[in-house]
């Protein structure tokens, strides 16, 4: 087994503080599952290159706890790892890209501050990855909908999280949902341990997994212990702006936590400040623009079919920024109507930019 025998202990000190993070939001104390006497194999420095000749085994030599923190306080893992120098070389071929890593489990549509907290906890244990499923909507027959974050923009967001994760940006790893849909909770954890060869998982307290979502967080901890990998369960990041009287999302799972559903609702309402608080950044809309999409030298007008992710609701949005490639940002106003997105600048002539290509990807950040 890749990770040596482990003993998983549930951290009994569940801190229920709700400290503000400065944006009207708060963190509940993380419930950390602690490990004693187990070995970690970190993943390769660059999962895509596979050009390393040796994997180092690291040993957890002290437990770690969790506390409620404000945004200025960062919990530190004291004396957690010690490197062993007598490990044999391991073959690179055949290893999964997440081998030896710590995977955060969830649906990472919005890449909001709750998702960021999962990766922060993963980075404190080892190399952080986001493990998610693709093709879920098609398999389950859900109506297709635009993503909150454009696929081409996700790497930028993850890179921005590096400063929270020990200067190491988390990487994404996707699994076809159809390939795991019928797995029992035990089979799913065994896949993580034996096939993907991860050394640990991080999940939220409401995480469900396995066929028909039959497994919960406590079962995840138990199964991970049996498979010799660690599990870290953290409390949900709560949306402190919306009180209990206003939590009307229509979602029975909604207990007031930050979620992709809340982000979608805030976008639909056009509340861009609230969206920024939930995301931990300004919402960025990606447009696919052609030269004929510029009716004037200071305006871009594209149909909704040319946007790559979810726009805010119908309305006029001022104090936005237009970004074209590596060009500096340009102040602009955005008008969203039922069929088009209009972007108008006051000072810069868009026709002066390089439009030699058939189309360009243009970004708009909402203030």
Swiss-Prot record:
One of its GO terms (biological process) is riboflavin biosynthetic process. It is found in: Plastid, Chloroplast. Pathway: Cofactor biosynthesis; FAD biosynthesis; FAD from FMN: step 1/1. It comes from the Eukaryota. It is an enzyme of class 2 (transferase). It catalyses: FMN + ATP + H(+) = FAD + diphosphate. Residues 1-57 form a transit peptide. Disulfide bonds: none annotated. The keyword Cytoplasm does not apply. Transmembrane segments: none annotated. Its EC number is 2.7.7.2. GO terms for cellular component: chloroplast. Keywords: ATP-binding, Chloroplast, FAD, Flavoprotein, FMN, Nucleotide-binding, Nucleotidyltransferase, Plastid, Transferase, Transit peptide. Its cofactor is Mg(2+). One of its GO terms (molecular function) is FMN adenylyltransferase activity. The keyword Nucleotide-binding applies. Catalyzes the adenylation of flavin mononucleotide (FMN) to form flavin adenine dinucleotide (FAD) coenzyme. This is FAD synthetase 2, chloroplastic. It comes from Arabidopsis thaliana (Mouse-ear cress).
């Amino acid at each position: 087994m890749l990770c040596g025998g482990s003993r998983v202990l549930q951290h009994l000190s569940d801190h229920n503080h709700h400290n503000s993070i400065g944006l009207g939001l708060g963190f509940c104390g993380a419930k950390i599952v602690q490990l004693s006497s187990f070995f970690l194999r970190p993943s390769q420095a660059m999962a895509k290159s596979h050009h390393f000749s040796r994997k180092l085994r690291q040993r957890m030599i002290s437990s770690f706890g969790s506390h409620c923190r404000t945004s200025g306080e960062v919990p530190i893992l004291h004396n957690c790892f010690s490197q062993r120098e007598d490990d044999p070389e391991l073959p690179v071929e055949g290893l999964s890209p997440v081998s030896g890593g710590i995977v955060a489990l969830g649906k990472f549509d919005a890449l909001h501050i709750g998702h960021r907290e999962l990766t922060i906890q993963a980075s404190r244990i080892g190399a952080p990855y986001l493990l998610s499923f693709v093709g879920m909507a098609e398999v389950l027959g859900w109506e297709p909908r635009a993503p909150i974050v454009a696929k081409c923009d996700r790497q930028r967001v993850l890179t921005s999280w590096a400063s929270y994760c020990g200067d190491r940006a988390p990487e994404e790893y996707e699994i076809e949902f159809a390939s795991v849909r019928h797995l029992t909770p035990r089979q799913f954890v065994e896949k993580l341990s034996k096939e993907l060869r991860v050394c640990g998982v991080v999940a939220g307290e409401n995480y469900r997994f396995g066929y028909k979502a039959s497994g919960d967080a406590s079962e995840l901890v138990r199964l991970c212990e049996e498979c010799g990998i660690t599990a870290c369960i953290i409390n949900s990041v709560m949306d402190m702006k919306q009180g209990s009287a206003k939590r009307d999302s229509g979602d029975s799972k909604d207990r007031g936590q930050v979620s992709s559903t809340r982000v979608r609702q805030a976008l639909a309402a056009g509340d861009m400040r609230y969206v920024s608080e939930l995301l931990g950044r300004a919402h960025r809309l990606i447009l696919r623009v052609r030269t004929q999409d510029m009716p004037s030298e200071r305006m871009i007008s594209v149909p909704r079919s040319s946007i790559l992710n979810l726009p805010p609701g119908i309305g006029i949005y001022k104090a936005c920024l237009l970004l074209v490639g590596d060009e500096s940002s340009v102040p602009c106003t955005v008008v969203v109507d039922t069929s088009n997105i209009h972007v108008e600048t006051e000072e810069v002539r868009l026709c002066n930019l390089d439009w030699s290509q058939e189309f360009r990807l243009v970004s708009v950040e909402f203030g």
